[in-house]
């Protein structure tokens, strides 16, 4: 393998959504391949036809591409090692299985599901680790089953599977890039089914053959596959192939350190996309679930290119990684704060136009959908929103008249003379020829100070009548963005609708 071009792969099953753990696996494979100037391959492992979901393959690849994880070779992009869908490679697996049968590394097994379950229960009662009892291992391979009976079953067309013959009394050893040396006793390894009765290979068999034929140099996958490694290494040995280097990633855990699962929250990448998370934040987040740049490094926000430049498998830890939603939310806010106005506009404007189709506004459409107006809203609100869609959904008063006024805020901020003060302040605003935040603030101070009042007696009521809520960005800047005509109209409407709470 010395001098071999680095080639990694992500091999999902088309059984549904892309799990965040799957995204991390794909990302680490992609980052390592790109860092080493190698190739990243996507292969679809659909050997379990009963679990196949229509459209899942396309959705998986679409989600990966949304995240910026683009394959060099895949079902969509092709390549010299295809097909890249396992169900289209059945003749390849059959050929290699025949070779193992001829070399006495595999054998036919006619055990029924009932027999297998009975044997499993018996072993459990005896306190043994369940594994196949080798009833159908032929005499010529050290078993007790006569070859004549096996031929008779085959000629009768009875259903069978093909199992690998695990050598007795040996140790299977390998070096994991993340975990170091690992050793398994062959006594703990089951005679794995290689070919199922439907003619499809199992994952274990197909993945080994495909990884070799596709010239995969490094296998980077989740810790849950660690126990399968000795079976795979034996298959490489049976074929006389050199095994790829391997790295098994740490588990993803809930905050209570239980394994991340749908029972405790969203685990599908699509769920987070629907909630409004950006690809940059999600990729950044999953990259940090197990990897860090090193001691003393305080950087937490990384672009995909920065991750590519700095990633290394040696900096991936062994311990389980805690999936903390607060960290993802924090990252999303960092990206919004630092994203260019132009990029935010490209997202916010279509969202607003869509909202205006559902709910017309009395504000001039040309004004509130203009780049200059939306840019002002974005600059004012980018520190306060958590998602791009909140520039519309969390900031509705920039586009629509308040339909109501927050009762708690009115109760807290309204005084017996509030309506009178607001009405008297209208002429001060009308007199402003240049409706800027600075001029609005100066006018308010000039209005309240002679009365011996604090600014707050007007600031809070003004916010309520112009936005409908008791919180938000700088009042003066908000009023400037809304514009003189809108502000005056909303004050007058508020005076009609709000009275001193009882």
UniProtKB/Swiss-Prot annotation:
Enzyme Commission identifier(s): 6.1.1.17
Record's subunit section: Monomer.
Pfam family, one: tRNA-synt_1c
Keyword Nucleotidyltransferase: no
InterPro entries: aa-tRNA-synth_I_cd-bd, aa-tRNA-synth_I_codon-bd_sub2, aa-tRNA-synth_I_CS, aa_tRNA-synth_I_cd-bd_sf, Glu-tRNA-ligase_bac/mito, Glu/Gln-tRNA-synth, Glu/Gln-tRNA-synth_Ib_cat-dom, GluQ/Sye
Disulfide bridges in this chain: none
Membership in a protein family: Belongs to the class-I aminoacyl-tRNA synthetase family. Glutamate--tRNA ligase type 1 subfamily.
Gene3D superfamilies: 1.10.10.350, HUPs
Short motif 'KMSKS' region, span: 259-263
Residues noted as binding ATP in the record, renumbered to the chain: 262
Localisation per UniProt entry: Cytoplasm
Task performed by this protein: Catalyzes the attachment of glutamate to tRNA(Glu) in a two-step reaction: glutamate is first activated by ATP to form Glu-AMP and then transferred to the acceptor end of tRNA(Glu).
Protein name per UniProt: Glutamate--tRNA ligase
A GO BP annotation: glutamyl-tRNA aminoacylation
GO cellular component, one term: cytoplasm
Reactions listed under catalytic activity: tRNA(Glu) + L-glutamate + ATP = L-glutamyl-tRNA(Glu) + AMP + diphosphate
CDD domains in the cross-refs: GluRS_core (cd00808)
Organism: Chlorobium chlorochromatii (strain CaD3)
